[in-house]
C-alpha cells in the first residue's frame, strides 16, 4: 500500500529531491532572484520565461483537452508569468483570452517584457472594468490565475476580491501560477478572498504558505519546478538560508530504513508509561496504548481508572495496566511518581480530565521529568489544558505554582491542536492560525522542548536547536475523535526506542500518523469521510517496516 502511494508521485532529479525537502521564505527568494539569474548568465526576464514555460508545461499536461484558456494577469511579475503562458498556449493552438487588472503604475520591467512578447505574436488583452460585471467567453474551459504573487499580505484589494469570488464560482478548472492569489506565501493565511486552485505550479523553492495554514483548501495539487537552478539552490549558503524542512512520504525510508537489531529484546526497545483515562474517558488511553505497542515500544504500561483495566486488557493484552483508585491529590501524585521510576518514556494526557487525577498526573510528570532529563515526556490533551492553567493562573493553577516553577525540559514533546495552543499562549485560535510557524516557536519555548502544532500542515519546532519542519502528510479524514490519542501513543512508542533525537522522533511520529491516514483514504478509493482513529493503527507496521525504495523509486517525489 505504501508503494502504491509512492507510485502516484512525480519524477524528480536527485537535487530536485533535496529541494523538495526544504522550504524557504518567499521574501528570501525575492531578494535572491537576481543572483539566481546571474548564476545562469541570464537576466530576470529570461528567468520569468523559464517560470512561465514550466507552468505552461504543467498545465498543458494536466488539461490536454481544454481548448480555451482564460488567463488573468495582475500588475506584478505573477502577471508577467501569465503573459508567457498565454504566448505558449497560443503557439500550441489554444484559444487564449487575457484579462488584465487595471493598474496605475507601469508593469515591472520583466512583466512588461513578457507583455511585449505576447503582443508581438498577435496576442491581445482586455482590461477589466472595476465595479462592472465580469464578462467571460462562454466556452472558457481553463482559468489560469496570475493575479497576485507571493508578496501579498492581508486581503486583496476590492477589485481583485470581486474577480476572485467570481471565478471561484465557475464550474471550470482553475490553476495558479506560483501561489493562489490571496494566499499569504509566508504563513498560509487567507485574509480575504483567495483563488481555489485545482493545481498550483511553484518555482525555484517551496514556500511555507503553500504547505500549512489554510493552504490545503486553496493550493490543490502542488507542482514544484526548480527552473534549472538545482545546483545554485543546493549550495551550502542557500541551504543554510532554508526556513525549515518539509517532511513527506519519502522520509519514511530515512526515519525507518535502519532495521531493528537481531539481538534486540523488549527491555532495550523502551518502557513507556501512559497516564490518562479518568472516569468517563477510557477510550483515549486504549487507543494510545494500542498505537504505542504497534509502533514498536518494548513494554507499555497504562495508568488509568479501575473500570478501564478489563476493557484495555481485552483489546490490547500486550499492555500492562495499573489501576489508580485513590482520589486524594497527594496520594495520587506519590503513586504516579513511584510508577514513573520504571519507565524510560512518559506520556500524559489522553482522557486525563482536569480534576484532581489530572492535576496530580501533570505535577508528578513534570517533577519526574525535571529530575530525569534523559527521559522523554509527551504531553497532550488535558495535560496541555492544565499546563495552560498553570501558566496563566487559572483552574487551580495558582495552587500548583501558576507557571512560576515550570521546568526546562529539552526532551519534552507537547502536541496541541489550535484550541489548546491558544489556551497555552493566552490568545485567540485565529491568532495561532494566522502564523502557525511563529505560534509553534512560542509554544516550544514554554518547556524548552519540541512542539508539534496539529492541523493541516503540521508544524514541528524544537526550541533548543531552532529546527522547524512542516509535515506534509495526512488528510481531512483525520478530523475525528481519537486521532490525537493515537498520535500520542505513536510519539511515546517511537521516543522509547531512541532511534532519533526528540525533534526527528516528533517528525517521524507525525509522518507515520499522516501517512497511515492517507493509506486508509486511498484504499479502494474510499476517501476521507468517516475514517476512524483506530483504523490508522493497523497500517502503522506497514510504514515503520517499509523496505527502502529501489533506485528507480528513489527518483520519485512524495509531493509537489
UniProtKB/Swiss-Prot annotation:
Among CDD domains, the record links this protein to: YXKO-related
Task: Choose any GO biological process term that the UniProt entry carries and state it.
Answer: nicotinamide nucleotide metabolic process
PROSITE patterns associated with the record: YJEF_C_2, YJEF_C_3, YJEF_N
Q: Which residues lie within the region annotated NAD(P)H-hydrate epimerase?
A: 1-241
Statement: the UniProt record of this protein carries the keyword Cytoplasm: no
- Write down the EC number: 4.2.1.136, 5.1.99.6
* Residues given in the record as (6S)-NADPHX 1 binding sites: 160, 178
Sites where the protein binds K(+): 78, 145, 181
Record SUPFAM superfamilies: Ribokinase-like (SSF53613), YjeF N-terminal domain-like (SSF64153)
Residue ranges of domain YjeF N-terminal in the record: 29-235
One GO MF annotation is: ATP-dependent NAD(P)H-hydrate dehydratase activity
| Catalytic activities | (6S)-NADHX + ADP = AMP + phosphate + NADH + H(+); (6S)-NADPHX + ADP = AMP + phosphate + NADPH + H(+); (6R)-NADHX = (6S)-NADHX; (6R)-NADPHX = (6S)-NADPHX
Its function, per the record, reads: Bifunctional enzyme that catalyzes the epimerization of the S- and R-forms of NAD(P)HX and the dehydration of the S-form of NAD(P)HX at the expense of ADP, which is converted to AMP. This allows the repair of both epimers of NAD(P)HX, a damaged form of NAD(P)H that is a result of enzymatic or heat-dependent hydration.
List the protein's name.
Bifunctional NAD(P)H-hydrate repair enzyme
Taxonomic source organism: Leishmania infantum
Amino acid at each position: 500500500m505504501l508503494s502504491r502511494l509512492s507510485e502516484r508521485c512525480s519524477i524528480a532529479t536527485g537535487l530536485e529531491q533535496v529541494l523538495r525537502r526544504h522550504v524557504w521564505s518567499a521574501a528570501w527568494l525575492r531578494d535572491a532572484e537576481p543572483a539566481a539569474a546571474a548564476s545562469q548568465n541570464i537576466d530576470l526576464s529570461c528567468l520569468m520565461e523559464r517560470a512561465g514555460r514550466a507552468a505552461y508545461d504543467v498545465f498543458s499536461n494536466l488539461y490536454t483537452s481544454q481548448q480555451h484558456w482564460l488567463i488573468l494577469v495582475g500588475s506584478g511579475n505573477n502577471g508577467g508569468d501569465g503573459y508567457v503562458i498565454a504566448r505558449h498556449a497560443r503557439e500550441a493552438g489554444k484559444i487564449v483570452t487575457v484579462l488584465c487588472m487595471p493598474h496605475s503604475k507601469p508593469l515591472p520591467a520583466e512583466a512588461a517584457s513578457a507583455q511585449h512578447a505576447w503582443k508581438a505574436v498577435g496576442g491581445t488583452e482586455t482590461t477589466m472594468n472595476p465595479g462592472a460585471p465580469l464578462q467571460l467567453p462562454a466556452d472558457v474551459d481553463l482559468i489560469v490565475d496570475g493575479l497576485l504573487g507571493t508578496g501579498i499580505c492581508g486581503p486583496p484589494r476590492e477589485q481583485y476580491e470581486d474577480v476572485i469570488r467570481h471565478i471561484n464560482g465557475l464550474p471550470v478548472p482553475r490553476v495558479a501560477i506560483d501561489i493562489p492569489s490571496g494566499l499569504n506565501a509566508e504563513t498560509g493565511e487567507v485574509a480575504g478572498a483567495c483563488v481555489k486552485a485545482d493545481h498550483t505550479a511553484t518555482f525555484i523553492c517551496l514556500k511555507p504558505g503553500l504547505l500549512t495554514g489554510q493552504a490545503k483548501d486553496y493550493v490543490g495539487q502542488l507542482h514544484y519546478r526548480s527552473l534549472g537552478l538545482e545546483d545554485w539552490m543546493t549550495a551550502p549558503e542557500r541551504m543554510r538560508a532554508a526556513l525549515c524542512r518539509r517532511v513527506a512520504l519519502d522520509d519514511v525510508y530515512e526515519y525507518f530504513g535502519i532495521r531493528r537489531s537481531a539481538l534486540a529484546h523488549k527491555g532495550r526497545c523502551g518502557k513507556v508509561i501512559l497516564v490518562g483515562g479518568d472516569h468517563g474517558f477510557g477510550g483515549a488511553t486504549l487507543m494510545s496504548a494500542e498505537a504505542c505497542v504497534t509502533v514498536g515500544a518494548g513494554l507499555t504500561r497504562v495508568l488509568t481508572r479501575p473500570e478501564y483495566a478489563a476493557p484495555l486488557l481485552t483489546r490490547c493484552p500486550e499492555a500492562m495496566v495499573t489501576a489508580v483508585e485513590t482520589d486524594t491529590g497527594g496520594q495520587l501524585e506519590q503513586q504516579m511518581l513511584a510508577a514513573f521510576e520504571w519507565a524510560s518514556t512518559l506520556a500524559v494526557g489522553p482522557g486525563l480530565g482536569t480534576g484532581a487525577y489530572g492535576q496530580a498526573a501533570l505535577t508528578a510528570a513534570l517533577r519526574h521529568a525535571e529530575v530525569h532529563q534523559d527521559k522523554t515526556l509527551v504531553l497532550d490533551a488535558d495535560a496541555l489544558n492544565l499546563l495552560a492553567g498553570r501558566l496563566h493562573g487559572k483552574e487551580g493553577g495558582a495552587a500548583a505554582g501558576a507557571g512560576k516553577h515550570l521546568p526546562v525540559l529539552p526532551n519534552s514533546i507537547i502536541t496541541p491542536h489550535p484550541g489548546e495552543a491558544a489556551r497555552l499562549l493566552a490568545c485567540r485560535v485565529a491568532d495561532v492560525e494566522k502564523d502557525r510557524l511563529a505560534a509553534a516557536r512560542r509554544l516550544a519555548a514554554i518547556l524548552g522542548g519540541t512542539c508539534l502544532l496539529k492541523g493541516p500542515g503540521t508544524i514541528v519546532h524544537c526550541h533548543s536547536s531552532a529546527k522547524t519542519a512542516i509535515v506534509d502528510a495526512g488528510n481531512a479524514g483525520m478530523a475525528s475523535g481519537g486521532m490525537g490519542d493515537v498520535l500520542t501513543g505513536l510519539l511515546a512508542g517511537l521516543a522509547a526506542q531512541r532511534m532519533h533525537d526528540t525533534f526527528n522522533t516528533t517528525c517521524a511520529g507525525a509522518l507515520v500518523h499522516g501517512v497511515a491516514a492517507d493509506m486508509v483514504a486511498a484504499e479502494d478509493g474510499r476517501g476521507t469521510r468517516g475514517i476512524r482513529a483506530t483504523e490508522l493503527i493497523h497500517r502503522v507496521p506497514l510504514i515503520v517496516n517499509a523496505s527502502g525504495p529501489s533506485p528507480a523509486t528513489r527518483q520519485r517525489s512524495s509531493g509537489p
